[in-house]
């Protein structure tokens, strides 16, 4: 019988290594094909389904590991329980625990009798604070149970400065039991401590959820006597679903976070200071309106909403800049609250009659104008340009009659004329030419040696055309012939002169 042979068989858990694989969800290093239980008769998969192949592989693997034909149900269950206990991670030394399992003869009862708390890791305790009540809890305890225990402690004792820290009596057996019950949910949870801010909702109901806030990311900023908390990134967590290390704090109440400051005296002496701090004041007002969503909904009649508007317009002489007075921007999430608060503040009475604000006669505000030399700067663009063209002083160049608006532009332009004159003037005979090429051709005359020389008589010429005409003398060539008298000429100029003088009537 399998039950009689079971005590003599070792489960050999130390030879089984759990490794993940892409081809199957679980794979053991032990050779499955050599096991007699692995030779099972499966009908061949005609469609080649991957799910069917995966199930067949898992079937063979678990049969090879548990060996149901050799072991009883209790032995297989004991082996699964031991493997699950090792995977949870509560044991300190897995190798020592496996040796104890082998020493007990693979009997779960004997194995549990030999166990002590020395093989377990000490539980990690987390300091939790909620509405004045503080206690230490195990990291594996559910969040819902933590809140329940803190509520019981709060109802039993009222928080005082003397008993502010009261540890809850939680034994290790209870902590370990709680951790094993929630081990399935705790395998993927991190061990980073977070700070939870538990507050009442705007409707005044009991706590429905916890606001989990990272402690490192949300510092508190103080300004005077008003404390602002900026939740840059907050998320809601349901009760009993989170088992991270948490630290609860009570939400700020109207008594803890004052929303009103003492009214300031906006007298003539303080007007200049208000001008300089106009931007900072409006920025603080928007921040305080943003925080009004986390407080039970009341009438927001704070002075911080009013003081962002009534600052005199900065002026320069008698010309205002035209800067709008209200430059406060509120975030999207608080636009409704801002509209309600502004409607309540300004619909019933004049804001200038609020206490602490000195009432002044309303001065007429002129229309904003551009800061130009005179008030004609508001004219349309075309007329504006015409006026400047009409009033501008023009400077005329005497050489080319060009007009310039500035004297420095005229002087710069006249230098170009001087440069051109120096380029067009012959240095030897002071003769002026229209083009630079003509000046260069003329300068050849003043050279001691002409560049073009006759090869027959070695006479030199300044131009190539003159040299060609001279060479015709030596060759006797006369290319130009008169059609009327058949007379020949060497040069075209002589030919045309002959036509004008002798054949004009013809």
From Swiss-Prot:
GO molecular function annotations of the record: DNA binding; zinc ion binding
Zinc fingers classed as C2H2-type: ranges: 395-417, 424-446, 452-474, 480-503
Annotated region Disordered: the residues are 238-264
Instruction: Fetch the InterPro entries from UniProt.
Output: SCAN_dom (IPR003309), SCAN_sf (IPR038269), Znf_C2H2_sf (IPR036236), Znf_C2H2_type (IPR013087)
Kindly list the places in or outside the cell where this protein is found, as annotated in its UniProt entry: Nucleus; Chromosome, Telomere
Q: Which GO terms describe its cellular component?
A: chromosome, telomeric region; nucleoplasm
The record's tissue-specificity note reads: Highly expressed at the 2-cell stage but its expression is rapidly turned off.
- In this chain the SCAN box domain maps to 37-119
Q: What is its main location?
A: nucleus
Q: Which PROSITE patterns match?
A: SCAN_BOX, ZINC_FINGER_C2H2_1, ZINC_FINGER_C2H2_2
What keywords tag this UniProt record? Chromosome, DNA-binding, Metal-binding, Nucleus, Repeat, Telomere, Transcription, Transcription regulation, Zinc, Zinc-finger
Tell me which SMART domains the record gives.
SCAN, ZnF_C2H2
What biological function has been recorded for the protein in this entry?
A: Transcription factor required to regulate early development. Binds telomeres and plays a key role in genomic stability by regulating telomere elongation. Acts as an activator of spontaneous telomere sister chromatid exchange (T-SCE) and telomere elongation.
- From the Swiss-Prot or TrEMBL record, give the protein name: Zinc finger and SCAN domain containing protein 4D
Q: Which organism is it from?
A: Mus musculus (Mouse)
Its lineage opens with: Eukaryota, Metazoa, Chordata, Craniata, Vertebrata
Gene that this polypeptide is encoded by: Zscan4d
């Amino acid at each position: 019988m399998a039950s009689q042979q079971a005590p003599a068989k070792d489960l050999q858990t130390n030879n089984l290594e759990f490794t993940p694989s892409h081809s199957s969800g679980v794979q053991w290093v032990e050779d499955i094909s050599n096991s007699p239980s692995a030779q099972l008769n499966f009908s061949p998969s005609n469609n080649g389904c991957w799910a069917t192949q995966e199930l067949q592989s898992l079937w063979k693997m678990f049969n090879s590991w548990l060996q149901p034909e050799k072991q009883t149900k209790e032995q297989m269950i004991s082996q699964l329980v031991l493997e699950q206990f090792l995977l949870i991670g509560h044991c300190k030394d897995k190798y020592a625990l496996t040796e104890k399992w082998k020493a007990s003869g693979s009997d779960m009862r004997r194995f549990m009798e030999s166990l002590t708390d020395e093989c377990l890791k000490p539980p990690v305790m987390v300091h939790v604070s909620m509405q004045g009540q503080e206690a230490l809890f195990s990291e594996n305890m559910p969040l819902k149970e933590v809140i329940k225990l803190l509520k019981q402690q709060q109802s039993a004792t009222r928080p005082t400065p003397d008993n502010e820290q009261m540890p809850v009596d939680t034994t290790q057996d209870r902590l370990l039991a709680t951790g094993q019950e929630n081990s399935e949910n705790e395998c993927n949870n991190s061990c980073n401590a977070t700070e939870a801010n538990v507050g009442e909702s705007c409707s005044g109901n009991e706590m429905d959820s916890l606001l989990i806030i990272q402690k490192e990311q949300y510092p508190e900023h103080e300004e005077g006597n008003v404390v602002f908390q900026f939740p840059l990134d907050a998320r809601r967590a349901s009760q009993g679903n989170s088992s991270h290390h948490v630290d609860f704090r009570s939400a700020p109440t109207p008594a803890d976070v004052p929303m009103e400051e003492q009214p300031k005296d906006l007298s003539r002496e303080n007007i200049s200071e208000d001008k300089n701090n106009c931007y900072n004041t409006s920025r603080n007002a928007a921040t305080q309106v943003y925080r009004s969503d986390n407080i039970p909904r009341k009438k927001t009649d704070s002075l911080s909403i009013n003081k962002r508007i009534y600052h005199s317009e900065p002026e320069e002489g008698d010309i205002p800049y035209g800067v709008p007075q209200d430059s406060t921007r509120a975030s999207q999430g608080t636009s409704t609250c801002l509209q309600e608060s502004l409607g309540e503040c300004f619909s019933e009475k004049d804001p200038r009659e609020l206490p602490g604000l000195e009432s002044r006669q309303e001065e007429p505000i002129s229309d904003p104008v551009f800061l130009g030399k005179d008030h004609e700067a508001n004219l349309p663009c075309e007329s504006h340009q015409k006026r400047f063209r009409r009033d501008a002083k023009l400077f005329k160049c005497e050489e080319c009659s060009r007009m310039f608006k500035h004297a420095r532009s005229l002087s710069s332009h006249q230098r170009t004329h001087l440069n051109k004159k120096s380029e067009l003037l012959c240095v030897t005979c002071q003769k002026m030419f229209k083009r630079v090429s003509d000046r260069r051709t003329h300068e050849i005359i003043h050279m001691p040696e002409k560049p073009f020389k006759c090869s027959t008589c070695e006479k030199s010429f300044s131009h190539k055309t003159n040299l060609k005409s001279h060479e015709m003398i030596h060759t006797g060539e006369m290319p130009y012939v008169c059609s009327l008298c058949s007379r020949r000429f060497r040069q075209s100029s002589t030919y045309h002169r002959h036509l004008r003088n002798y054949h004009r009537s013809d």
